[in-house]
Amino acid sequence: MPRSTKKGPFFDHHLIKKVESAAGSKRPIKTCSRRSVILPQMVGHTIAIHNGKNYYPVVINENMVGHKLGEFSITRVFKGHGGDKKSGK
């Protein structure tokens, strides 16, 4: 169920402050706030999103606006389904 439109998008205020202060910087902005919605002010910035173990840099473009940061940094590694347990005779 999506968030109510009258509430508006959720974002952490400390993240917006970091984006505004890093206007001309090329360094990635580190954040653990996977729940924040990508706003138009973030377009063009590189944000390093924490996945629980590492920070993965993601360059924000216009198509990502409205999505959450966590959608672009996967947390689980799929190693395939279990193979056939029979020996290959």
UniProtKB/Swiss-Prot annotation:
Keyword rRNA-binding in annotation: yes
GO CC annotation terms, alphabetical: cytoplasm; small ribosomal subunit
Pfam families per UniProt: Ribosomal_S19 (PF00203)
GO BP, sorted A to Z: ribosomal small subunit assembly; translation
UniProt keyword Kinase present: no
Molecular function terms, GO-annotated: rRNA binding; structural constituent of ribosome
Stored Gene3D superfamilies: 30s Ribosomal Protein S19, Chain A (3.30.860.10)
Recorded family membership: Belongs to the universal ribosomal protein uS19 family.
Protein name: Small ribosomal subunit protein uS19
Gene: rpsS
